[in-house]
Swiss-Prot record:
Sorted UniProt keywords: DNA-binding
Statement: the UniProt record of this protein carries the keyword DNA-binding: yes
Residue ranges for the DNA-binding region feature of this UniProt entry: 201-220
HAMAP family in the cross-refs: SfsA
UniProt cross-references to CDD domains, sorted A to Z: SfsA-like_bacterial
Pfam families, per database record: SfsA (PF03749), SfsA_N (PF17746)
Species, as recorded: Salmonella gallinarum (strain 287/91 / NCTC 13346)
Name this protein carries in UniProt: Sugar fermentation stimulation protein A
């Protein structure tokens, strides 16, 4: 994924009301950015960090600038735009960069499924193969080199795991992909210290046939690419 036009840089002043962030550009201009992340953003929104933002061509948007990346004072890059996790995963599947998800010729997005009427991020299909249901989660919470999900209690995430267990029980392929969008993370675990129920459900899901995968994105202000498998400890 190439950023075109190129991202612009600024210095973070504060994030507030979850969806907004005040920044100062290198020439001293004050801007308010849209923050496309409803999570806690622990370690991703420290005042003084460098932020990289995109600008929409839609002139009707109240906040035309979108916060895409944080470059921390320690040199780590973090993608804070949660929409990018799905885009990067879709691109990686289509370009056959994820061997575990190769061999399908049809990719559908936002398909309704399950007893709780959820929407799956992606469904892959191919002749003579069971349908493959994929749920994608964005991982940005880091403690040293350890990456964790979620960064806050997520009942929605718990529901998705229950739905995937149902998919696996019905004979289909069920997969949860943790897209690691933090350059300092080298391994992944569920955040048992934040959402114990999610961690327990993830272990249960794996035991019932749900595949748990984690891939790390190469991040820069110029491009992003999901391709590197990350070790998982449940």
């Amino acid at each position: 994924m190439l950023f075109s036009p190129p991202l612009q840089r600024a210095t973070l002043i504060q994030r507030y009301k979850r969806f907004l962030a005040d920044v100062i550009t290198p020439d001293g201009t004050a801007l308010t950015l849209h923050c496309p992340n409803t999570g806690a953003m622990t370690g991703c929104a420290t005042p003084g960090d460098t932020v990289w933002y995109s600008t929409s061509e839609n002139t009707k948007r109240k906040y035309p600038h979108t916060w895409e990346l944080t470059e921390t004072q320690f040199g780590a890059f973090i993608c804070v735009n949660t929409l990018r996790a799905n885009q990067l995963t879709k691109e990686a599947i289509q370009e056959n960069r994820l061997p575990a998800l190769a061999g399908y010729n049809i990719l559908k997005s936002e398909v309704k499924y399950g007893a709780e009427r959820s929407r799956i991020d992606f469904m892959l299909q191919a002749d003579f193969r069971p349908d493959c249901y994929i749920e994608v989660k964005s991982v940005t919470l880091a403690e040293k080199e350890n990456g964790y999900f979620p960064d806050a209690i997520t009942e929605r995430g718990q529901k998705h795991l229950r739905e995937l267990m149902g998919v696996a029980a019905a004979g289909h392929r069920a997969v949860v992909v943790f897209a690691v969008l933090h350059s300092a993370i080298t391994r992944f675990s569920p955040a048992r210290h934040i959402d114990i129920k999610y961690a327990q459900l993830l272990s249960e899901a794996q035991n019932k046939g749900v595949e748990v995968l984690a891939y790390k994105a190469e991040l820069s202000a110029q491009k992003m690419e999901l391709n590197e498998p990350v070790p998982i400890t449940l």
